Amino acid sequence: MYWIYNVLLIFYWIGLIPVILYRLAFEDGFYERIKQSAGYMPASLLKKIEGRRAIWIHAASVGEIVATSPLVKEVKKEFPEAVVVVSVVTATGHAMAHRIIPEAEGIIFFPLDLPYLTRKILHIIKPITILLVETEIWPNFLRIAQSEDIPVMMVNGRISDRSMKRYKYISAFTKEMLRSIERFCMQSKFDAAHIEVLGAHTPDITVTGNMKYDQTY
């Protein structure tokens, strides 16, 4: 299944080349965004992570970033010596992260989910663990993290009815991806039941509530 996914992904990005070129020409900040997504990290971040343990937290957009803020605070309390790197997908999420997560040493754009780029960035950041906020399931990222023996946890996990139907279309692939995640901390019993049906091991699932309610900014 992974080779099919990768072929489709390559064609997808080839199709987006005209859009990318247009945005590079006319959209402020897009060059830095695509540069980071291609594996080129800011020099300031490279200095901060050199020789230190890193915890990577991925939160796609604004909603996930709101939930990530209290999580980062707790991580810094428990592991004050660790570098916290927060990755996002959207420009609005990036701006929000800078505004409400000052504790993070690095805020970056998530890499394109291509095997070479994913492996490259994992080797640069060298995270001791990865926390995925809500339902950020990226096949190559999970597979390569597992191959590098990097533990991955889903936090504030949520599986809507709509997502459930979508994942069921690729049930075998979904199950394989979920087996790359060691722990599932879900928002509700409803979400826990959904993730279990999709293939997560029951002993690895915990209901922890919604972290967005812990936000104090």
Regions flagged by a language model, labelled:
Residues 1-8, 12-22:
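Membrane-interacting alpha-helical segments
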